[in-house]
Design a protein with these regions (language model features):
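Bacterial N-terminal signal peptides that target proteins for export
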Residues: 2-12
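Exposed boundary/loop context
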Residues: 3, 16-18, 94
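Bacterial N-terminal signal peptides
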Residues: 11-22
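N-terminal export/targeting and maturation segments
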Residues: 23-73
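Short, well-ordered, aromatic-rich surface patches in folded extracellular/luminal domains
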Residues: 26-38, 65, 89-144
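Short, low-complexity, polar/charged sequence segments that are solvent-exposed and flexible
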Residues: 50-55, 73, 85, 126-129, ...
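Mature extracytoplasmic domains of secretory-pathway proteins
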Residues: 62-96
Length: 144
């Protein structure tokens, strides 16, 4: 009996290690990108989910458009270098929105089991890690 258990343990150990390592390294699936800008008069919310980008102004749906797969890949690749767990620690280049009436913004990434939110930042001057993503989302809603 001990020999059988030893043989099974020896043959199953590499498989268990492979399962554990591959499960640990694979990222969770991104479900939704939620970007919001608020200024003195208007609150704009951009929601990107399932190749659909929606624009809301003051909680009213203004526009909804389908995004091409190529653009989806660009958006997701721009997020690949960003660790979502550390999103709340992004360095804010400017805090002008606090005193000059500039629009303030916030990004929220929603995954299968967790969501991660950035600190509030100046909408015209996002953290360097988001400098591709934010303009891309705003441009896609205008183009489509």
């Amino acid at each position: 009996m001990t020999k059988v258990f030893s043989a099974l343990r020896g043959s199953c150990l590499p498989i268990l290690l492979l399962i554990c390592i591959s499960g640990f390294s694979s990222p969770e699936k991104l479900i939704q990108i939620h970007y919001q800008e608020v200024d003195l008069a208007v609150k704009k919310t951009f929601i990107y989910e399932d190749l659909t980008l929606q624009l809301f102004e003051n909680e009213t749906l203004i526009k909804s458009s389908k995004i091409r797969l190529n653009d989806d890949m660009k958006i997701r690749s721009s997020l690949s270098s960003l660790n979502p767990v550390l999103l709340h620690q992004l360095s804010i280049p400017s805090k002008k929105y606090r005193y000059d009436g500039a629009a303030m913004a916030r990004l929220k990434l929603v995954y299968m089991t967790n969501s991660f939110t950035s600190p509030i930042f100046d909408a015209d001057n996002p953290p360097s890690e988001l400098r591709y993503l934010i303009p891309k989302i705003k441009t896609l809603i205008q183009v489509n």
